[in-house]
Design a protein with these regions (language model features):
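Hydrophobic transmembrane alpha-helices of multi-pass small-molecule transporters
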Residues: 24, 28, 34, 38-100, ...
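Alpha-helical transmembrane segments of multi-pass membrane proteins, especially transporters
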Residues: 57, 61, 83, 120, ...
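Hydrophobic core segments of alpha-helical transmembrane domains in multi-pass membrane transport
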Residues: 58-72, 107-115, 200-203, 207-211, ...
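Transmembrane helix-loop junctions in multi-pass membrane proteins
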Residues: 70-85, 118, 122, 204-220, ...
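Membrane-embedded alpha-helical segments and adjacent helix-loop junctions characteristic
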Residues: 80-179, 279, 308-397
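Membrane-core helix-loop-helix motifs of multi-pass transport proteins
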Residues: 177-267, 401-412, 418-463
Length: 463
C-alpha cells in the first residue's frame, strides 16, 4: 500500500460529513474564511469565488447586449430597446427572488434527507458496494482509502441533482487523492477519472430542475425525468470510455464488466420498453417513474434511519439548517446571471446568435427546433449559474412545456460546468498540468448535448 504524504496542517476543522463540508465550503472556518489550504501552495486557495473566466463571461453578456442595442438604435431606428433592457433588469431581479423562495425549500428539504442517509450508513454501504469497481477504475487508490468514501458521497449528491452540495465533498475527495499523487502539480489518473465523471453530470434525480419547472408553472415538473436519465447516461458512458482509452484501463476485467453490464442491461431494457410506447405514453411514463423514484428515495432514507435508530427528525433539522445556508448564499449569483441573460435577450443579441445557429443548422439540412435550447448548452461548460439563468429565461420566453424549454432542461441535467469544475477542483490542490482531462470532459459534454436533442425529439416531438 502506498504511503500517504504528509501535508501542511489545515487551519480549519475539517468537515467529516456532507453538511459540515458545505459549511466549510461556504466560509464558516474561523481562521481562513472561504479558503482551503492546498498541500502544494503556501497561501490559501480561494474556492468560494468563481474563476476569472466567469468574470469575462458575465462582462461579455453586458458588452454584447450594449453592441446589439446600439446597432438596433443607430441602424434599425429602434430607441425603445433601452427601455426594454431596463425593464428586463428589474423583472429578472424579481424573478431571482421568486426562484430563490422555492430553492430555499428544495435545498433545505434534500440536505435534511441526505443527513439522515449519512447517519443511517447508506453512504458507507454504497461505498462498500462500489469498492470493487473503483479498485479497477482507480488502481492506484488503495482499498479502504478515505477518497473512496468521499467520491461516493460526491456522486450521491450529484445523482440527486444537488450540485451545490456535491462541490465541497468533491474538493475533499480531490485533496485525499492528492495525497497519493506522485507529481504534485500534474493530475493523476485517478483525479482525471474523478473529474471527468463529475463533468459528465451523472444525475438520476434532478430535483433542482424539477424545482425550476415547478416554479415556472409546469403542469408536470418531472416530465423530463426519463430524457435526463438517458442523456446523462450517454454523457457518463462517453466520459468513462474516453478516459479508459487514454489511461488503458482494463474495462474487460470480469468485475468491471459485471458492473458495466448490469448498468447496460438496465438501460437497454428501459430503452427497449420505451420504444414500444407512443409519444403520449412516453410522457406519462416519464412522469410516473420520476415521481415514484423521487418519493421512493425519500422513503428509503427514512426507513434506513429508523432501522438504524437514527433520530430522523433531529437529523433532518440538523441537515436542513445547512441547506438553508447554502440557498441563501446562492441568491447574489442568481441575480447576477439572470439579469445578465435578461439584458442579452432584451437587446436582441441572444436572438441574433440563435438565428445565426439556426441558419447554419438549416443549411446542412437538419431540423432546427432544438436551436432555441442551445444557449443553455453553450454556456454550461463555463458557468452553472449562467446556464441556469438561460434555462429559466428559455422557459419564460417559449413556455415551460415547450420543446425548447424541455430540451434545455434536459441539457441542463446532462451536462456540467466543465471549466468551473476543473478550475476549482484542480486549483484547490495546486494542479497545473491537467493532461487529457479537458478533452475527455468536453467529449462527455458533447455526448450529453447530442443525446438530449435526440431523446427530446423522440419523447416530445416538436410540441
Amino acid at each position: 500500500m502506498q504511503a500517504r504524504r504528509e501535508q501542511p496542517p489545515v487551519r480549519c476543522v475539517a468537515a467529516r460529513d456532507l453538511g459540515g463540508a458545505i459549511v466549510f465550503m461556504l466560509g464558516q472556518c474561523s481562521r481562513y474564511p472561504r479558503a482551503v489550504r492546498s498541500p502544494t501552495m503556501a497561501r490559501p486557495v480561494l474556492i468560494g469565488t468563481r474563476p476569472f473566466m466567469l468574470n469575462r463571461l458575465w462582462l461579455g453578456f453586458f458588452l454584447a447586449a450594449a453592441v446589439a442595442a446600439l446597432a438596433r438604435w443607430l441602424l434599425g431606428g429602434d430607441p425603445a430597446v433601452f427601455a426594454a433592457i431596463v425593464e428586463s433588469l428589474f423583472s429578472m431581479a424579481k424573478l431571482s427572488v421568486d426562484v430563490m423562495l422555492l430553492l430555499f425549500g428544495t435545498l433545505t428539504l434534500w440536505m435534511g434527507l441526505l443527513r439522515i442517509a449519512e447517519r443511517a450508513g447508506l453512504v458507507t454501504a454504497l461505498a462498500r458496494a462500489l469498492g470493487p469497481l473503483f479498485r479497477r477504475l482507480m488502481p492506484e487508490v488503495p482499498e479502504g482509502h478515505p477518497a473512496i468514501g468521499l467520491i461516493t458521497l460526491n456522486f450521491a449528491a450529484n445523482v440527486l441533482g444537488l450540485d451545490n452540495a456535491a462541490t465541497p465533498v468533491g474538493l475533499r475527495a480531490m485533496r485525499e487523492l492528492q495525497t497519493l499523487n506522485p507529481s504534485s502539480d500534474t493530475a493523476s489518473n485517478a483525479q482525471i477519472l474523478f473529474l471527468v465523471l463529475n463533468a459528465s453530470s451523472l444525475t438520476l434525480l434532478p430535483v433542482s430542475i424539477f424545482m425550476y419547472r415547478a416554479q415556472q408553472g409546469a403542469a408536470d415538473p418531472t416530465l423530463v425525468f426519463l430524457p435526463i436519465l438517458l442523456a446523462t447516461s450517454a454523457s457518463t458512458l462517453v466520459g468513462l470510455l474516453s478516459v479508459a482509452f487514454m489511461q488503458r484501463l482494463k474495462l474487460w476485467d470480469p468485475v468491471a464488466l459485471a458492473y458495466l453490464a448490469a448498468v447496460a442491461l438496465l438501460l437497454g431494457g428501459l430503452i427497449a420498453f420505451l420504444t414500444t410506447l407512443s409519444a403520449a405514453a412516453l410522457a406519462s411514463a416519464s412522469s410516473l417513474v420520476g415521481n415514484l423514484a423521487l418519493f421512493g428515495v425519500i422513503i428509503v432514507f427514512l426507513l434506513a434511519g429508523a432501522i438504524k435508530r437514527v433520530p430522523v427528525y433531529e437529523a433532518f433539522i440538523e441537515g436542513a439548517k445547512q441547506g438553508f445556508d447554502v440557498a441563501r448564499d446562492l441568491l447574489p449569483y442568481l441575480v447576477a446571471m439572470l439579469c445578465a441573460v435578461g439584458v442579452l435577450r432584451a437587446s436582441g443579441a441572444l436572438g441574433y446568435a440563435i438565428d445565426g445557429i439556426r441558419w447554419v443548422v438549416k443549411g446542412v439540412g437538419l431540423n432546427t427546433d432544438f436551436v432555441a435550447a442551445l444557449p443553455t448548452a453553450l454556456v454550461k461548460p463555463f458557468s452553472g449559474s449562467a446556464a441556469r439563468a438561460m434555462l429559466i429565461e428559455t422557459m419564460q420566453h417559449y413556455g415551460v412545456d415547450s420543446f425548447p424549454a424541455l430540451t434545455a432542461a434536459t441539457m441542463q441535467g446532462s451536462t456540467e460546468t466543465t471549466f468551473y469544475v476543473l478550475a476549482v477542483y484542480y486549483g484547490a490542490v495546486g494542479i497545473r498540468r491537467v493532461r487529457h482531462t479537458v478533452g475527455c470532459a468536453l467529449l462527455a459534454d458533447l455526448a450529453g448535448i447530442v443525446a438530449s436533442i435526440a431523446v427530446c425529439t423522440w419523447f416530445f416531438g416538436t410540441r
